[in-house]
């Protein structure tokens, strides 16, 4: 087994442009998932925080959805933040001038109180071990009437379901044209070292404890 980089940000930051290709080859229905998330966002938010902007896979659709919004994009990897900044500047220069780009871990980033109409994230929150603490801070950061929308990798509610889910992921990654053996091993090493997957029911419980209401899962 190969050594995984010290942090998740090291792992993804080292990929740069290759991350775009890998995420499409390793995550089933990635584009459909992003489209579903966008479809459930408010039409005209004024302030949006994205936790884990990566290379802009969700960031650019967010800006396309609400180009007049003020965005804050946060990621633990400086390389990923700069990649998202460059892509936003290229495709949406006016929005990029209003946007804030932050290199920080979610656990350390100061979100403030009543700052955002929307807090959102794509395939990032499973890197956080204490999700309850993060959810409480997100709840404080959201304005009255605001919303928290995210997509992520979860664990199964039972060991059997979890094993079946991961086997489905591996089958997808091993399909012709998707991931190489080395890429799959790297993903497995990374998951073992850095991921903290949580069942859907536990997410619901932690979100409710944090003060969220109207909690739902609209796609899985």
Predicted regions mapped to residue ranges:
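Short catalytic micro-motifs in class I SAM-dependent methyltransferases
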Residues: 123-124
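A short glycine-rich, Lys/Arg-flanked "PGG" loop and its adjoining helix->strand segment in the class I
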Residues: 133-144
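Conserved alpha-helix/loop element of class I SAM-dependent methyltransferases that forms part
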Residues: 28-45
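A short acidic, Gly/Pro-enriched loop at the edge of an enzyme's catalytic core
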Residues: 111-118
